[in-house]
């Protein structure tokens, strides 16, 4: 399991990056969600890694 936290604002970001954050369940700064470490999830995390903090859960 991966704990993913949004640490930077989505304001002014590319629309596809905002959509990726929303697909991960991240809408507000400080929100943390847990996801399985599937290739699809890891790809989404990699795409917006500059907005996130990722930890192993």
Swiss-Prot record:
InterPro entries: Ribo_uL30_ferredoxin-like_sf, Ribosomal_uL30_bac-type, Ribosomal_uL30_ferredoxin-like. GO terms for biological process: translation. The keyword Ribosomal protein applies. The keyword Ribonucleoprotein applies. Keywords: Ribonucleoprotein, Ribosomal protein. It comes from the Bacteria. GO terms for cellular component: cytosolic large ribosomal subunit. One of its GO terms (molecular function) is structural constituent of ribosome. NCBIfam families: rpmD_bact. Belongs to the universal ribosomal protein uL30 family. Part of the 50S ribosomal subunit. This is Large ribosomal subunit protein uL30. It comes from Clostridium perfringens (strain 13 / Type A).
């Amino acid at each position: 399991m991966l704990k993913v936290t949004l640490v930077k604002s989505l304001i002014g970001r590319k629309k596809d990056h905002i959509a990726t954050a929303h697909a991960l369940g991240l809408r507000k700064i400080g929100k943390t969600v847990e996801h399985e470490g599937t290739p699809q999830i890891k790809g989404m995390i990699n795409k917006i890694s500059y907005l996130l903090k990722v930890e192993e859960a």
